[in-house]
Curated annotation (Swiss-Prot):
HAMAP family: Ribosomal_bS16. This is Small ribosomal subunit protein bS16. GO terms for molecular function: structural constituent of ribosome. It holds the Pfam family Ribosomal_S16. GO terms for cellular component: cytoplasm; small ribosomal subunit. GO terms for biological process: translation. Keywords: Ribonucleoprotein, Ribosomal protein. SUPFAM superfamilies: Ribosomal protein S16. It comes from Brucella anthropi (strain ATCC 49188 / DSM 6882 / CCUG 24695 / JCM 21032 / LMG 3331 / NBRC 15819 / NCTC 12168 / Alc 37).
Length: 134
């Protein structure tokens, strides 16, 4: 039997409240569970009452092989009960392929315009030099 430490939604419509439960992976989100090991009230401001965890029972279930879900792992990491691996995706903030092509085209057009302006300035200065020498 594979176990997860996950959130089970409670509360009323538009007023969420979650129980942190140990459940079999095959059972429904709000269905049968083995034990309640905490609670999360997302409606509260970020304080100590927002997330309540039973540290001893969580450690017990992790030792038994229960895997926390991503959101629960965040809570456990903040509480110092488990370590969440850091994710590194250095290309996430970069623009997409087409946007990069558009930026390259704009940069090339800007360079060409600057080169033409430099040629025009040089051509305007050259006749003045010839007239001064004659």
């Amino acid at each position: 039997m594979s176990l997860k430490i996950r959130l089970a939604r409670a509360g009323s419509k538009k007023r969420p409240y979650y129980h942190i439960v140990v459940a079999d992976v095959r059972s429904p989100r709000d269905g049968r569970f083995i034990e309640t090991v905490g609670a999360w009230n997302p409606m509260l401001a970020k304080d100590a009452e927002r997330v309540k965890l039973d540290a001893d029972r969580i450690q017990h279930w992790i030792a038994q092989g229960a895997q926390p879900t991503d959101r629960v792992l965040r809570f456990l990491d903040q509480a110092g009960l488990a370590k969440r691996p850091t994710r590194s995706n250095p290309t996430k903030g970069e623009p997409g392929k087409k946007a990069q092509e558009r930026l390259a085209m704009a940069k090339q057009a800007e360079e060409e315009a600057a080169a033409k302006a430099a040629e025009a300035a040089a051509a305007a200065a050259a006749p003045a030099e010839e007239a001064a020498s004659e």
